[in-house]
């Protein structure tokens, strides 16, 4: 596998994202990278891929170039490998938030949420409680279709369709969280960081985020206490606990996630339809 896939984010105050955009675009193109870099007043969120030499050069650029004023000097990257480029083009986008929650009072760049690392979380889940004896509840902050690909055992899943719904569902389900240690998690850490800050802001105690998200957990401890794969937003569709592309795919017709089991259905036609969008399925639901 010759392509290195990098993902990272960091909350940091950026005064003028528009001034950064042409410089970041130029450097990414010069390095032959493809993917997406999001710039917002609250920070950076990126998914890029390229050769080892060029991704290493990109990491050095982000950490050390004077443009960034040292804001990302300690930026940590999650890495996986693939045999082909997962992205079709290079985009640097300006956004209001690097992950949309529509809660402007939440400012992660002013202070991180408490976090738990993967080995500690595994230890808690092995025992069924944290170091103080409180039961541990895993809270999935991802969208429902992502959760369906895989999640932690017995995780709370409120079936949200977009992250901006998270504050409302938490208010509706506070009773699920009282008296427990809550560990919010997501793919790479960005959503669960905002989620943890929001929960603390509304008075929910003993809240943590999973440091580095599911992918970092896979990297450090494998798939313990996790079932299924982890959905990712590129051609690989999902990664297994060994951080290898799984057999899960997306329907060419409707972009629904199609598990290996669903691919056995006669309604799944590669490159055309799946059980969600096949005409026979639609007719049955309408009946």
Curated annotation (Swiss-Prot):
Pfam families given in the database record: Rhodanese, UPF0176_N
The UniProt record lists the keyword Oxidoreductase: yes
GO BP terms: tRNA modification
UniProt EC number: 1.14.-.-
SMART domains: RHOD
Domain Rhodanese as annotated: residue spans: 132-226
Annotated function: Catalyzes oxygen-dependent 5-hydroxyuridine (ho5U) modification at position 34 in tRNAs.
Full protein name: tRNA uridine(34) hydroxylase
Species the sequence originates in: Paraburkholderia xenovorans (strain LB400)
Gene symbol of the encoding locus: trhO
